[in-house]
Amino acid sequence: MSYLLVDVGSTFTKAALVDDRGGLLARAAVPTTVGPGRDVLEGVAGVCRALGPGGSVPDPLDPAERDRVLVCSSAGGGLRLAVVGYERAVTAEAGHRVGLSAGAKVVHVATGRLTTAGVADLRAARPDVVLLVGGTDGGNAEVLLHNARRLARSRVGAPVVVAGNVEAQEEVAAELARTLRRATLTDNVLPRIGVVHPGPARRAIREVFLEHVIGGKGLSRGPRFAQLVRAATPDAVLAGVEVLADVRGGDVMVVDVGGATTDVYSVLTPQGEDASLRKHVVATLWHARTVEGDLGMRWGAPGVLEAAAAEALPVADDPQLRSWVERVHARPELLPTTAQEHEHDLVLATTAATVAARRHGRPGAPGEAPRPLKDVRLLLGSGGVLRHAAPGAADRVLAAVLADHGGGWRPPADAGTRVDTAYLLFAAGLLAGERPDLARAVAAQL
């Protein structure tokens, strides 16, 4: 018996076929079929055909085989999340970090009491889900209740996940129910000062995404696609990193360099609080994801040069590289053909990965310690530019990250490097909930 794992991305639909022992039987990728008159299920059917002959691949549209088909998606903009919190450096920051760990693209963060202008800004961000947080358990609930009333009266139609002061949740739910708002209550993301509790909110965001969001993006004409999707793609990838860390028995860090963004994931072993940590800041999120929306190989290429200049990296002054960046930004489908163009892409990837790793590892707020990455045992590279790189090229990118000792963070001291060449992290993550044994077998191949 085989399992079909599919990632419907904004550009490509990728799939892996694994057997009942976790062995990789086949993998394939086809362009995602999005746009007017298109249906993403066309791309899913296409990638199934590319995997192998009829009969060898589970049929995603056959209800009898649906348990063997697991899909994640970032098409249609993925999961757009807005965070409404109290203090920017505390509850709102905790909500922001938890939202990223849930695989969301955080499109707006509002702090303090929502005003008329604040509600307008929130609505303009077009969130798919609003994460409403505020206060520690048993603490001040005034701002949380005020914001619940504002949301209830607003024209923001997105469902609300409430993850604030649990002692005020019944009142918050009552306020939202007055105008029939779709609300999901879950545990506080910051139950007490210095403690982040991400798991319940992450699960609630995932459930709301699957129940209310994915079916409303216009990606497919019927309900079948929404019934297949189990997670937003970054959520599945983080779950895969968690499985990989468990299999490896140590801390893992992943740098995923994409066309528009560069994501960094880390799964770390909890440690004692740093002695320099101030009492009011948000504690370390041990399973974390950060997204750098200005760093990418094509749509995000200009941002790489801007970040290089801000970080005082010398590549920002290369006129030939700047010319290449202008070309690929204007034509994202452009691929390098000459040795010089391949070198330009490698420099872009190295710079994006290095800056993204710095931002992931640096303190998130004044008074915090850097993220404790020094004990990471595996740095895994991902993204098309690394998967399809010439021999040794991806090693250069990852080696540069590990050698970055002047970037205001603590790089891993003794980490090995690998590249997810078969693109299996998402597959391990999708299997983690349904078949953890297969998830571990898939992750062991990385």
Language-model features, listed with the residues they occupy:
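Short acidic-glycine loop/turn motifs at beta-strand connectors
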Residues: 19-23, 75, 258-261, 268-271, ...
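Short acidic (Asp/Glu) and glycine-rich catalytic loops that position anionic groups and cofactors
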Residues: 23-25, 288-290, 327-336, 403-410
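Short glycine-rich, Thr/Ser-proximal phosphate-binding strand/loop in the N-terminal lobe
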Residues: 12-40, 101-105, 277-301
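Long, internal scaffold/assembly segments composed of regular secondary structure
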Residues: 228-302, 306-307
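Short beta-strand scaffold segments in enzyme catalytic cores
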Residues: 13-19, 81, 254, 262-267
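Nucleotide/phosphate-binding catalytic cleft detector across ATP-hydrolyzing
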Residues: 1-5, 20-22, 30-38, 42-45, ...
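A glycine- and small/hydrophobic-rich beta-loop-beta segment
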Residues: 304-364
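Asp-based phosphoryl-transfer active-site loop
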Residues: 4-14, 256-262, 379-382
